[in-house]
Design a protein with these regions (language model features):
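Short, amphipathic alpha-helical "lid/cap" segments that border enzyme active or binding sites
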Residues: 32-39, 120, 124-131
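Short, active-site-adjacent cap segments at secondary-structure transitions
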Residues: 58-60, 83, 145-147
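Short aromatic-enriched loop/helix-cap "lid" or pocket-rim segments at secondary-structure transitions
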Residues: 15-18, 63, 86-90, 152
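Domain-level recognition of soluble alpha/beta enzyme cores
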Residues: 156-183
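Generic beta-sheet signal
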Residues: 3, 134-144
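Conserved beta-strand termini and adjacent loop/short-helix elements that scaffold enzyme active sites
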Residues: 6, 77-79, 180-182
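Active-site-proximal alpha-helix that buttresses catalytic centers in soluble enzyme cores
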Residues: 7-74
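Phosphate-handling substructures
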Residues: 26, 68-126
Length: 183
């Protein structure tokens, strides 16, 4: 076992905002439950020496709740922060972005979006750097950040396959993507 990736728990977002890197988006009650539940599963199935988390609140909260079961050091790294997505999405409600051309590209193949501040290849590079510097870590991050890493690392055919759900653990074993989920 090398490193595991954990997507943060469900976020409290009653206005359905594309929050991206906006501060202050915390876990919902369900998200808190998800984090504690997956923490128990991680403890039973893996040897973790440290947790590295995105600096965003929802990821830090997930890391802290999981760590109630692991009791290891927690570090914060910008290398696994949320991908911001297409320009102009952050802070808008989802209904405002779902009819855009960028959203259509995001749903079919986000690699074709040309209005991003950071290409997904660059996301992979920053995450891969962190992965190569660590072993036996749980990295608490975000859906598209995690997906970018595994898509490029495993040279997969389609980006939108295998996106992690809230509190899914993903890792590579024998060259294949493996998932530990709450269900």
């Amino acid at each position: 076992m090398n490193n595991l990736f954990l997507r943060h728990g469900e976020v409290y977002n009653p206005k359905n905002i594309h929050y991206s890197n906006l501060p202050g988006f915390s876990l919902s009650t369900t998200g808190n439950f998800q984090a504690k539940s997956i923490g128990q599963k991680i403890k039973k199935n893996f040897e973790i020496e440290k947790i590295i988390t995105s600096p965003l609140l929802r990821a830090r909260q997930t890391a802290q709740l999981v760590n109630e079961f692991l009791n290891v050091k927690i570090e914060i790294s910008n290398d696994i922060i949320e991908w911001q997505g297409p320009e102009g999405w952050t802070g808008k409600i989802f209904n405002e972005i779902t009819n855009t051309q960028a959203y259509s590209k995001y749903k079919s193949n986000p690699l074709t979006i040309d209005t991003v501040k950071e290409p997904l290849e660059k996301v992979y590079e920053r995450v891969n750097k962190l992965v190569n510097e660590n072993q036996h870590c749980l990295m608490v991050s975000h859906q598209d950040t995690i997906r970018a890493y595994f898509y490029f690392e495993l040279k997969e055919a389609r980006f939108n396959l295998n996106k992690p759900n809230h509190c899914d653990v993903q890792y590579i074993k024998n060259g294949k993507l493996k998932v530990l989920s709450l269900t």
